[in-house]
Design a protein with these regions (language model features):
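An amphipathic alpha-helical interaction segment
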Residues: 80, 85, 106-168
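Basic/polar phosphate-binding segments, predominantly the helix-turn-helix DNA-binding elements
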Residues: 146, 169-170, 174-185
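Absolute protein N-terminus
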Residues: 1-3
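Surface-exposed loop/turn and secondary-structure junction residues enriched for glycine/proline
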Residues: 90, 97, 106-107, 178-180
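A small-molecule sensor/coupling module
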Residues: 101-102
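Residue-level marker of regulatory loop/turn positions in helix-turn-helix DNA-binding domains and
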Residues: 24-27, 152, 156, 169, ...
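N-terminal regulatory/effector-sensing and dimerization cores
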Residues: 7-98, 127-128
């Protein structure tokens, strides 16, 4: 299994694309996913979550996740990447917690979330305060409607998972096998 660390720290960025299989990866950005056509599978930690058209999901910073696409359908997804430091009121929670289930089914997605995603996807330039307000609205709905759990419970006892997670969190430090806690004793 190839794991990838992505450095996404550009404030707020959006991609509207046809999803493909994406290998396990993690990054410091909050990843918002909204299926506009078809279906995809979102893997978070060791769990796989099915998403249909109209479903919304969020992956918190530094959580290993991946995507799978099955079937021959036309699938389109909006991906938003939100830099967590833009949201100081949520920053601590974003580091500690993760949604128990990252997917909200279409019937439960609040219309404000859909409008905010579409607004953020459609702009190329705009007032940074408006951009931040729309992104903040998404996070407000996430934290008020999605049950949270400790982020450490999302992971796995898998050696590769733990190694990638450790490197991602400590890449600015001098890293050696002796310093990695899961290789000791």
């Amino acid at each position: 299994m190839l794991l990838v660390y992505e450095n996404r720290n550009t404030g707020v960025s959006a991609e509207w694309k046809k999803p493909v299989h994406v290998p396990p990866h993690l990054h410091e950005a909050i990843e918002v996913v909204y299926v506009t056509d078809g279906e995809i599978e979102l893997g978070v930690g060791q769990e796989l979550f099915h998403m249909d058209e109209g479903d919304f999901a969020v992956v918190f910073p530094n959580v290993i996740h991946h995507y799978q696409v099955f079937g021959e359908k036309e699938n389109k997804v909006i991906f938003l990447y939100l830099e967590p430091t833009l949201f100081p009121s949520y920053y601590r929670e974003l580091q500690i917690y993760s949604p128990k289930n990252p997917v909200v089914k279409k019937e439960q997605v609040h219309p404000d979330v859909v409008n905010a995603i579409k607004y953020l996807t459609g702009i190329t330039e705009g007032d940074p305060r408006m951009i931040q307000a729309y992104a903040q609205m998404i996070l407000a709905h996430v934290f008020t409607t999605m049950p949270m759990m400790d982020k450490s419970a999302v992971g796995s006892d898998d050696l590769i998972y733990n190694a990638v997670e450790y490197v991602a969190k400590n890449f600015r430090e001098n890293i050696s096998l002796e310093k990695m806690p899961f290789f000791q004793g």
